[in-house]
C-alpha cells in the first residue's frame, strides 16, 4: 500500500462545537445535515428546520443526484454537483463537515463524504457520532435556516473512485477487484426483502463478500477504531493492500466500507454507484445469488 497523508475523515462533536462557538462556520468551514429517511418514517427536511447544528445547511440527496437515471440516487454530473454545493456556500477551499440524524449515529453522511471526494474535494469530514451524539452531549442547536453566500466550486470527477455496471460485470471474469456488500446479511443472502422496494428481489452479486455497514459502528454510534476495523476486514479475508469495490443497494451504505477502509489507511476504495438496484435489473440472472424466491442458491 502506498503511504500518503490522508485528510482527517472524522471530526469529533467536541471539535465541531468549539468551531461553532468560535464563529468559524463560514466560507472556510461549512456544516451539512445530510439526513434522509425511508418514506413514511421521518421527514429529514422538517427535522432540519426544527433543529440542527448552528450554521448547518441541509444537503438534499434527492436534489443532488442524476434525476434522469432510472436507478436510485446516482451521482449527478460534475456541473450539477458544482452548482448544488456552490449554492450551499462551498468552494474548493472549504472544509466540509457532514452529519445525519440517523439513530445508528451515521447513515447517509458517508455517502456525501464520498461524493465530495469523488468530485475532487479533499477537505471533507464526517461528524463522528452524528447528530445523535451532538444532542446527547448537550451541544447547541437552532431552528434558524442557514443562508450562506453562494460560492464557486469546481468539480473534477475522480473516476478511480467510481465503478460502473460494465466494469463490475467485467470484474466477474478478471477478478481484479475484491467486491464487498454492505447490506444486512438477510438482504445479502436473499432471505429478507429489500425495504420499500417494488420489483426488487434481495440477493447479491456473485463473488461478493458481506460486511454489514452497521457493524462498523459502536452501540453508541461512533466509528470503531482502525484496529477494530482492520480486524473486521481480516476476518472476512478482505485484503486492504489490494483493489476493492464496495456495493450495497443503491450506493449509499457502501460508502461506509470506503470510510472504514480510509480510516485503515486505504483511500482508494471504489463505489459501484448503481449497486444491487441496477445489477438486479440489468445483469444476467446467473451473475447474482439469492436464497429467496426466484433466486439462485
From Swiss-Prot:
<dbReference type="InterPro" id="IPR045078">
    <property type="entry name" value="TST/MPST-like"/>
</dbReference>
<dbReference type="InterPro" id="IPR001763">
    <property type="entry name" value="Rhodanese-like_dom"/>
</dbReference>
<feature type="modified residue" description="N6-acetyllysine; alternate">
    <location>
        <position position="14"/>
    </location>
</feature>
<comment type="function">
    <text>Together with MRPL18, acts as a mitochondrial import factor for the cytosolic 5S rRNA. Only the nascent unfolded cytoplasmic form is able to bind to the 5S rRNA. Formation of iron-sulfur complexes and cyanide detoxification. Binds molecular oxygen and sulfur.</text>
</comment>
<dbReference type="GO" id="GO:0005759">
    <property type="term" value="C:mitochondrial matrix"/>
</dbReference>
<keyword id="KW-0677">Repeat</keyword>
<feature type="domain" description="Rhodanese 2">
    <location>
        <begin position="173"/>
        <end position="288"/>
    </location>
</feature>
<dbReference type="GO" id="GO:0051029">
    <property type="term" value="P:rRNA transport"/>
</dbReference>
<dbReference type="GO" id="GO:0008097">
    <property type="term" value="F:5S rRNA binding"/>
</dbReference>
<feature type="region of interest" description="Hinge">
    <location>
        <begin position="144"/>
        <end position="159"/>
    </location>
</feature>
<keyword id="KW-0325">Glycoprotein</keyword>
<feature type="modified residue" description="N6-succinyllysine; alternate">
    <location>
        <position position="224"/>
    </location>
</feature>
<keyword id="KW-0694">RNA-binding</keyword>
<feature type="glycosylation site" description="O-linked (GlcNAc) serine">
    <location>
        <position position="35"/>
    </location>
</feature>
<feature type="active site" description="Cysteine persulfide intermediate">
    <location>
        <position position="248"/>
    </location>
</feature>
<feature type="modified residue" description="N6-acetyllysine; alternate">
    <location>
        <position position="237"/>
    </location>
</feature>
<feature type="modified residue" description="N6-succinyllysine; alternate">
    <location>
        <position position="175"/>
    </location>
</feature>
<feature type="binding site">
    <location>
        <position position="187"/>
    </location>
    <ligand>
        <name>substrate</name>
    </ligand>
</feature>
<feature type="domain" description="Rhodanese 1">
    <location>
        <begin position="25"/>
        <end position="143"/>
    </location>
</feature>
<keyword id="KW-0597">Phosphoprotein</keyword>
<feature type="modified residue" description="N6-acetyllysine; alternate">
    <location>
        <position position="175"/>
    </location>
</feature>
<feature type="modified residue" description="N6-succinyllysine; alternate">
    <location>
        <position position="14"/>
    </location>
</feature>
<dbReference type="InterPro" id="IPR001307">
    <property type="entry name" value="Thiosulphate_STrfase_CS"/>
</dbReference>
<keyword id="KW-0808">Transferase</keyword>
<dbReference type="GO" id="GO:0035928">
    <property type="term" value="P:rRNA import into mitochondrion"/>
</dbReference>
<dbReference type="InterPro" id="IPR036873">
    <property type="entry name" value="Rhodanese-like_dom_sf"/>
</dbReference>
<feature type="modified residue" description="N6-acetyllysine; alternate">
    <location>
        <position position="224"/>
    </location>
</feature>
<keyword id="KW-0007">Acetylation</keyword>
<keyword id="KW-0496">Mitochondrion</keyword>
<feature type="modified residue" description="Phosphoserine">
    <location>
        <position position="38"/>
    </location>
</feature>
<feature type="modified residue" description="N6-acetyllysine; alternate">
    <location>
        <position position="136"/>
    </location>
</feature>
<feature type="binding site">
    <location>
        <position position="250"/>
    </location>
    <ligand>
        <name>substrate</name>
    </ligand>
</feature>
<comment type="subunit">
    <text>Monomer.</text>
</comment>
<feature type="modified residue" description="N6-succinyllysine; alternate">
    <location>
        <position position="136"/>
    </location>
</feature>
<dbReference type="GO" id="GO:0004792">
    <property type="term" value="F:thiosulfate-cyanide sulfurtransferase activity"/>
</dbReference>
<feature type="modified residue" description="N6-succinyllysine; alternate">
    <location>
        <position position="237"/>
    </location>
</feature>
<feature type="modified residue" description="N6-acetyllysine">
    <location>
        <position position="163"/>
    </location>
</feature>
<feature type="modified residue" description="N6-acetyllysine">
    <location>
        <position position="236"/>
    </location>
</feature>
<dbReference type="GO" id="GO:0005739">
    <property type="term" value="C:mitochondrion"/>
</dbReference>
<dbReference type="GO" id="GO:0016784">
    <property type="term" value="F:3-mercaptopyruvate sulfurtransferase activity"/>
</dbReference>
<protein>
    <recommendedName>
        <fullName>Thiosulfate sulfurtransferase</fullName>
        <ecNumber>2.8.1.1</ecNumber>
    </recommendedName>
</protein>
<dbReference type="Pfam" id="PF00581">
    <property type="entry name" value="Rhodanese"/>
</dbReference>
Amino acid at each position: 500500500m502506498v503511504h500518503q497523508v490522508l485528510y482527517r475523515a472524522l471530526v469529533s462533536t467536541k471539535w465541531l462545537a468549539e468551531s461553532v462557538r468560535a464563529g468559524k462556520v463560514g466560507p472556510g468551514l461549512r456544516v451539512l445535515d445530510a439526513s434522509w429517511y425511508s418514506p413514511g418514517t421521518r421527514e429529514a427536511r422538517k427535522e432540519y428546520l426544527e433543529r440542527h447544528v448552528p450554521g448547518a445547511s441541509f444537503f438534499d440527496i434527492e436534489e443532488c443526484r442524476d434525476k434522469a437515471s432510472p436507478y436510485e440516487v446516482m451521482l449527478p454530473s460534475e456541473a450539477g454537483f458544482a452548482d448544488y454545493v456552490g449554492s450551499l456556500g462551498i468552494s474548493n477551499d472549504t472544509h466540509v463537515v457532514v452529519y445525519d440524524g440517523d439513530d445508528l449515529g451515521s447513515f447517509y453522511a458517508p455517502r456525501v463524504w464520498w461524493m465530495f471526494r469523488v468530485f475532487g474535494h479533499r477537505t471533507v469530514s464526517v461528524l463522528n457520532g452524528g447528530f445523535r451524539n451532538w444532542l446527547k452531549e448537550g451541544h447547541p442547536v437552532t431552528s434558524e435556516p442557514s443562508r450562506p453566500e453562494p460560492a464557486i466550486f469546481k468539480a473534477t470527477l475522480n473516476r478511480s473512485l467510481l465503478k460502473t455496471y460494465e466494469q463490475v460485470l467485467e470484474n466477474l471474469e478478471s477478478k481484479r477487484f475484491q467486491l464487498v456488500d454492505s447490506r444486512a446479511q438477510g438482504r445479502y443472502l436473499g432471505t429478507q426483502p429489500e425495504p420499500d422496494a417494488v420489483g426488487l428481489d434481495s440477493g447479491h452479486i456473485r463473488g461478493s463478500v458481506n460486511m454489514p455497514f452497521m457493524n462498523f459502528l459502536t452501540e453508541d454510534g461512533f466509528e470503531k477504531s482502525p484496529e477494530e476495523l482492520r480486524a473486521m476486514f481480516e476476518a472476512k479475508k478482505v485484503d486492504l493492500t489490494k483493489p476493492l469495490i464496495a456495493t450495497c443497494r443503491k450506493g449509499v451504505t457502501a460508502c461506509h466500507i470506503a470510510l472504514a477502509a480510509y480510516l485503515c489507511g486505504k483511500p482508494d476504495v471504489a463505489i459501484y454507484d448503481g449497486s444491487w438496484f441496477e445489477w438486479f435489473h440489468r445483469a444476467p440472472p446467473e451473475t447474482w445469488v439469492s436464497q429467496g424466491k426466484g433466486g439462485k442458491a
